């Protein structure tokens, strides 16, 4: 019966998540995020657009990233995560940082790319993130997480992106530089 009790805080939290997710465009996001993160999103957009050849799909993917980050930020700011979920968040952070370090290494050192390893690392990050947010987000939001991780875990994208003569080489260099900067400043 306690589940049916009206709580203003819950309504307020849902309203914040809804409003912020509706405002999730690259330009709005730039007012909430630093220059390095904005640059990273712009370069991820370029990579998505180059890979898919579809501007709308690339925009949707970046909007999904922004919506996910905003919603997680709202949940964290409102202390919605349990101690166990915060521990899982630390696990996600470690896994995601390992994925980022692998991306940097595979880009910077030719012929070291390991598709199976990177796909496994991306999939583990996805599972870790969903284990934190599943109780708090809708199925639609969880689907957004899957879309983002599935796109970036795609074998064709990864194999193309990490070839030494990749058509994505220039944008991958910018992405790697952005990841390096963001990791140094603790932004991701």
Swiss-Prot record:
Any one cellular-component term (Gene Ontology): cytoplasm
Matching Gene3D superfamilies: Tumor necrosis factor alpha-induced protein 8-like
Tree of life domain: Eukaryota
Example GO BP: positive regulation of apoptotic process
Single GO molecular function: cysteine-type endopeptidase inhibitor activity involved in apoptotic process
One Pfam family from the record: DUF758
UniProt record similarity statement: Belongs to the TNFAIP8 family.
Protein name: Tumor necrosis factor alpha-induced protein 8-like protein
Organism: Drosophila pseudoobscura pseudoobscura
């Amino acid at each position: 019966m306690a589940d049916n009790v009206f709580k203003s805080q819950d309504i307020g939290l849902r309203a914040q998540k809804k409003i912020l997710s509706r405002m999730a465009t690259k330009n709005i996001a730039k007012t909430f995020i630093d220059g390095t993160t904005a640059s990273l999103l712009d370069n991820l957009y370029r990579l998505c657009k180059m890979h898919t050849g579809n501007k709308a799909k690339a925009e949707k993917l970046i909007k999904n990233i922004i919506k996910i980050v905003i919603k997680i930020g709202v949940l964290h700011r409102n202390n919605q995560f349990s101690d166990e979920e915060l521990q899982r968040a630390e696990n996600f952070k470690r896994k995601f940082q390992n994925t980022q370090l692998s991306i940097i290494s595979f880009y910077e050192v030719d012929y070291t790319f390991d598709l199976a390893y990177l796909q496994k690392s991306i999939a583990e990050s996805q599972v870790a993130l969903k284990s934190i947010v599943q109780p708090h987000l809708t199925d639609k939001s969880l689907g957004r997480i899957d879309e983002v991780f599935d796109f970036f875990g795609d074998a064709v994208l990864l194999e193309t992106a990490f070839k030494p003569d990749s058509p994505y080489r220039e944008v991958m260099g910018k992405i790697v530089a952005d990841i390096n900067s963001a990791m140094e400043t603790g932004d991701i």
